[in-house]
């Protein structure tokens, strides 16, 4: 099959999903999404994040624990379902939302300058007084070999969010995530990452009122072939603006099993 029909089909599917589901206030999710599809692979993934700040700042102990199941059903398409448990500062943990996710890989891995995918997520909140939302945008990844003697991997997410329904707000939040890491060893890949959040792209306001974080991260994987593999990520993020907490710890643990 030629690449042009495939790219056309990808675009039509992406437009179709957006048209069907059509999008919650801006919230930072410390999770990087990757554009390369693992075809015929079953994945269980847990992410977690906890923030740190002064006790009465309203930014301390913000917790988020999304867990999801994903399946690579086609060479260019992965679908998943996510359950999110979280707690705002001063609150107890509660079930926040259920989300359905779609990853459409738009370019074959390694064929072009960078690998590209389109991500779409439809979220159904547990609270009936909250609006449904759709999150969408490009995922980009570039591997740079032999950068000063070491291979490096760079990943960028640019995601927009829209609420839908009669309770929806007009704002369009923007979430940006960037990660660069050194591919020293499959078990140990150190790097750094950035997470940014803007409440409304049409009215971004002052930089100090936006949420921006940066910090170190380590990632790696261990293979149990043919019984799958385990991946991990562990990072610390320092807040860069007055609207951001002073620090946050985030982690990711994932088990992948081919079928």
For each feature predicted by the language model, list its residue ranges:
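Cleavable N-terminal export/targeting peptides
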Residues: 1-32, 36, 258-259
